[in-house]
A protein has these predicted regions:
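Periplasmic-binding protein-like
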Residues: 23-24, 88-98, 193-201
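N-terminal beta1-alpha1 ligand-phosphate binding loop
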Residues: 19-44
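Short hydrophobic/aromatic-enriched beta-strand-loop microsegments
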Residues: 113-120, 156-162, 216-224
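Glycine/small-residue-rich loop that forms an oxyanion/phosphate-binding "nest" at active or ligand-binding sites
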Residues: 72-131, 135
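Active-site rim beta-loop-alpha module in soluble metabolic enzymes
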Residues: 141-200
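Short, structured coil segments at secondary-structure junctions
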Residues: 46, 110-113, 129, 157, ...
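N-terminal beta-loop-helix "entrance" segment that forms/cooperates
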Residues: 52-77, 169-174
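Short, flexible loop segments at boundaries between secondary-structure elements
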Residues: 220-237
Length: 238
């Protein structure tokens, strides 16, 4: 048995791993980009550096398939610009902060670092935490895409997709959006028999904690889930 004397120097403190994460909001609304960064920083480890950007051109919000198509060039340009930066500033992982996960396949082909979509991160987290989850999203036009992603990512775990039909920018700017979103979450849990809720819009990130308190079930925000998953993946990547 080893004996440590008083003269033995203490073991060095564990150095925090600096992880650089870049969140790309594919729409052009800067207030939403700032809210995404705030949500990510609240979830991140102290050794994680969070940056969030949005393209200068493209849709102001992403609420249908056409918006998703139009946002991809600007999204990919932001990722390419960051990847071409100096080594000490280059992101260790990228997060596409739109629930449709637009451009995810193309972004992964363009860079070596991990690229996460907030829908994929949230749905995998919800599938692990529950016997089945409901998605509560923004506009009805996004419901087919959410179902498509759910079947691709977590087949059988998604029990329903529900739209509050509140525009994305209103969710971002109006705290009063919380009440109808919370009521829809309650309806979804009852109707689907689910035991968790996935928030299907990055603008809903600030509602995750109060919804958990109100509903008493896991409420998964994709920004938070992607932050924590990216932190775990970076040390495992090449």
């Amino acid at each position: 048995m080893a004996v440590v004397s008083a003269s033995t120097p203490p073991a060095p403190a564990t150095t925090l791993l600096l992880v650089r994460l870049l969140f790309v909001n594919p729409n052009t609304t800067a207030t939403m980009t700032a809210a995404i960064a705030e949500a990510a920083r609240a979830a991140a480890h102290p050794g994680t550096d969070i940056r969030a950007v949005n393209p200068p051109d493209g849709p102001a919000s992403i609420e249908n398939d056409d918006d998703e198509r139009r946002c991809v060039p600007g999204l990919l340009a932001e990722i390419a610009a960051a990847a071409a930066g100096p080594d000490d500033a280059r992101p260790d992982a990228y997060v596409i902060a739109c629930f449709g996960d637009p451009g995810l396949v193309a972004a992964r082909a363009a860079v070596r670092a991990p690229v996460l979509g907030i829908a994929q991160a949230a749905m995998h987290a919800a599938a692990l935490l529950s016997g089945g989850f409901s998605v509560v999203t923004s506009m009805s036009a996004t419901v087919p895409r959410a179902w498509e992603l759910a079947q691709s990512y977590t087949a059988g775990s998604c029990l329903g997709v529900h739209a509050c039909d509140i525009p994305v920018l209103q969710i971002d700017s109006d705290p009063g959006s919380f009440v109808p979103i919370a009521e829809l979450c309650e309806q979804a849990l009852r109707a689907d028999g689910s035991t968790a809720v996935v928030l299907g819009c990055a603008a809903m990130a600030r509602f995750a904690h109060p919804l958990r308190e109100r509903l008493g079930v896991p409420v998964i925000d994709g920004v938070e889930a992607a932050t924590r998953l990216a932190e775990a993946l970076v040390p495992l990547s090449a």
